[in-house]
From Swiss-Prot:
GO cellular component: NADH dehydrogenase complex; plasma membrane
Oligomeric and partner information: NDH-1 is composed of 14 different subunits. Subunits NuoA, H, J, K, L, M, N constitute the membrane sector of the complex.
Record-listed E.C. numbers: 7.1.1.-
GO MF term set: NADH:ubiquinone reductase (non-electrogenic) activity; quinone binding
Name recorded for this polypeptide: NADH-quinone oxidoreductase subunit K
Highest classification ranks of the organism: Bacteria, Pseudomonadati, Pseudomonadota, Gammaproteobacteria, Lysobacterales
Amino acid sequence: MGHLLGLGAVLFCISLAGIFLNRKNVIVLLMSIELMLLSVNVNFIAFSRELGDTAGQLFVFFILTVAAAEAAIGLAILVTLFRTRRTINVAEVDTLKG
């Protein structure tokens, strides 16, 4: 269990670093958020396996479903944003059109 929790902690720290160090590219931000959800899933699996309860493993499937929907919606918004503004730089797309 310790190895899985360590893996989850390392993945979470990498994703947190990706969010804080790269605030310009929306694609990297989406990937970091997905990696953060993956690290939480690894921890759910580790605790579910240790306690012998399948509820944590079942909960992972729901999280993966929500994460897939989030990624699809995020990429659709990103494509629309690129078509209208010709950039995906966060600093340039933070204003609303009036």
